[in-house]
Swiss-Prot record:
The keyword Cytoplasm belongs to this UniProt entry's keyword annotation: no
Keywords associated with the record: Cell inner membrane, Cell membrane, Hydrolase, Membrane, Metal-binding, Metalloprotease, Protease, Transmembrane, Transmembrane helix, Zinc
Annotated residues for binding of Zn(2+): 146, 150, 223
Source species of the chain: Bordetella petrii (strain ATCC BAA-461 / DSM 12804 / CCUG 43448)
Protein known as: Protease HtpX homolog
Record gene name: htpX
Gene3D superfamilies: Metalloproteases ('zincins'), catalytic domain
Any one GO BP annotation for this protein: proteolysis
Transmembrane regions: 4-24, 40-60, 161-181, 197-217
Superkingdom field: Bacteria
Amino acid sequence: MKRIFLFIVTNLAVMVVLSATLRVLGVDRYITAQGINFQSLLILSVVIGFTGAIISLLISKPMAKWSTGARVIDPAAPGGSREAWLVETVHQLADRAGIGHPEVAIYDGSPNAFATGAFKNDSLVAVSTGLLDSMTEEEVAAVLGHEVAHIANGDMITLTLIQGVVNTFVVFLARVVGYFIDRTVFRNERGVGAGYFITVLVCEIIFGLLASIIVAWFSRQREYRADAGSAQLMGSREPMMRALARLGGLEPGELPKSFEASGIAGKGGLGAIFASHPPIQARIAALQHMRVV
């Protein structure tokens, strides 16, 4: 949950800064000077929407390290046999998945793990000390396979594209609603007034919350795919099923809110529609019915 929250917060922060800057520069007033110029508004919405998502993606790896306090393991000088095993296991899984070797990191915390990075060949896999201490090596390897599968599937890129599209609609619709509220409720006939800017701000918050349901749905689907990817990389579904079962009996480690959707375990937030992860039981059931080639 931690990683996705940070991604979304960074994304929204960039959107807000861009929106505010463009308002100060009078772009909103220009677009609505002669009624709404939908073509110009759409271009503005795309610029604001995708800029936030892309910047969030590009800084996702350093932000993840900073927010979790993760320590990257030097492959040439690991701090003991456990760290050496971690690096070797991640590299082997990456080779099977056909991607470059990710950086491998450890952070202190309850059982969890995550993967992040803008590019498949320049990514990061991090695992908590709590997870390492509570699982067998085979179960840890399955969790690492799950994270490597996220990278191989290009989940962060897809999330960025989805977030960009969602942002575009949020920005576009908020300004359309703001324009008509300013005209019909506040009776402003010249340019745009305070009613427009207040309505846009409120609508961006409301529409952004509703849009997060779409992002959460995608996150749940990618968890099923990553579970299946782990089973394929491990050559068996059993290790991942055992790892999930163990997680189901443990308190999921909380990642910083911005990165929650990247973790192996999450609490789901405000109800099922906002949950970044499916229920553990549903994930195990999906693995039971999959075919491992």
